[in-house]
Amino acid sequence: MTRTVHCRKYKEELPGLDRPPYPGPKGEDIYNNVSRQAWDEWQKHQTMLINERRLNMMNAEDRKFLQAEMEKFLSGEEYAQAEGYVQPKE
């Protein structure tokens, strides 16, 4: 049976992740409060931000920026977009 969580982003019960994506309390929080759908969408958005903004994951400031954007994205707040990106119409 699929594990469900009350997703922080979508405010509804959705299938959860199979395991925490990070070690420690942050990973446990995501595991318990973020759906697989929201996490998959974040990973795509994260890749777009890294590529479009040319973020260097060796740079502490770039990692801090990405961490803050992840919090915003997964909480349903307004978050940074890649410059010139237009969301596809559903």
Curated annotation (Swiss-Prot):
UniProt keyword Iron, yes or no: yes
An annotated Gene Ontology molecular function: iron ion binding
UniProt KW Iron keyword: yes
Biological process, per Gene Ontology: cellular response to oxidative stress
Any one GO cellular component localisation term in the record: cytosol
UniProt KW keywords: Iron
NCBIfam families cross-referenced by the UniProt entry: PRK05408.1
Protein family per UniProt: Belongs to the Fe(2+)-trafficking protein family.
Role this protein plays: Could be a mediator in iron transactions between iron acquisition and iron-requiring processes, such as synthesis and/or repair of Fe-S clusters in biosynthetic enzymes.
Protein name in UniProt: Probable Fe(2+)-trafficking protein
